[in-house]
Amino acid sequence: MVLKGTVRGVFLASEAKKRMISVGEARAIAGIGLAGDRYAKGVGSYSNATGANLKVRQISFIQREMIQLANRETEVPFEAVDTRRNVETEGIELEQLIGQYFSVGETLMYGTKMCDPCKIPSNVSGKKGFLEAFRGYRGGIRAQILTGGDIWVGAEIRIYVLGSKRRLAPGWSAFMSR
């Protein structure tokens, strides 16, 4: 069984603490991040990360269903762009991607860790309550970009369990066997 979801939004911010913008698609650069995004440029709020922590900040995801759930607890609703995550998803539980290989559009990624909420989304959006409403599993996840390619609104997200190489797109089997 292959678990699937869909990309519902793609967002970039050129600098730390600047508003994110919604884009129809973005180019994922292996080992770096999304072209034009603050973390790919090394100017994100947490770009000082080193070693293993650097890999976990290449791209971030948030689940549309968790935004809707969190908004039940806020006075002013948060939109996906307000969360400061790069990709809004629908139809897949993001915590299932931790420790898994998965594809998004043309890319292969590896889910690294949960994306703990901080105060920056509230500070940038001017909307109170992000830290509290998006606590725990609602904050989304971070991932490492293993192969570059395009990510777009409407792209499919698929989980690949190690050992199920026959489901991988051409060329990915060799990558997975490294």
Where do the protein language model's features map onto the residues?
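Electropositive, beta-rich accessory/interaction domains or terminal extensions
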Residues: M1-V104, L108-K113, D150, Y160-R178
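Short, structured beta-strand/loop micro-motifs enriched in basic residues and often containing a Trp
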Residues: D82-G91, A133-Q144
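Flexible glycine-rich active-site/ligand-binding loops centered on an Asp-His dyad
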Residues: G111-R142, S164-R178
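Glycine- and charge-enriched low-complexity intrinsically disordered segments
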Residues: Y137-G163
